[in-house]
């Protein structure tokens, strides 16, 4: 899923570009799936979850965002938590963090004969 999102990151948000040379960024609290920059150049921490994401996923990405903010010496960090869906606790927690966006993914198969 991470590879597919990297290839199609512009579908997540217009003019977004990965900023991590295709490698997960290591911070004190773990490994960030994708570090990107938005159209304004602001850093965006992207965490991917297959299936349902809960409040632990929100805590995880907030930890990553805090680590990046400290490393980069800026509070101008955005977060995008990408999952198939989010439980009530994740949605409630994310409402309190304006710089964090919950994004649902879907996919469809395309087939062609070889």
Which residues does each predicted region cover?
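Charged, terminal alpha-helix-loop-beta segments
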Residues: 1-114
């Amino acid at each position: 899923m991470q590879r597919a999102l990297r290839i199609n990151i512009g579908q997540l948000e217009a003019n977004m570009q990965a900023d991590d040379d295709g490698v997960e960024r290591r911070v004190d609290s773990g490994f960030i799936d994708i570090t990107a920059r938005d159209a304004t150049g602001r850093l965006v921490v992207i965490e991917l979850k297959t299936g349902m994401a809960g409040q632990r996923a929100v805590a995880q990405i907030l930890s990553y965002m805090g680590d990046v903010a400290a490393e980069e010496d800026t509070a101008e960090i955005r977060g995008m938590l990408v999952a198939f869906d989010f439980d009530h606790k994740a949605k409630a927690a994310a409402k309190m963090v304006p710089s964090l966006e919950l994004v649902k993914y879907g996919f469809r198969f395309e087939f062609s004969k070889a």
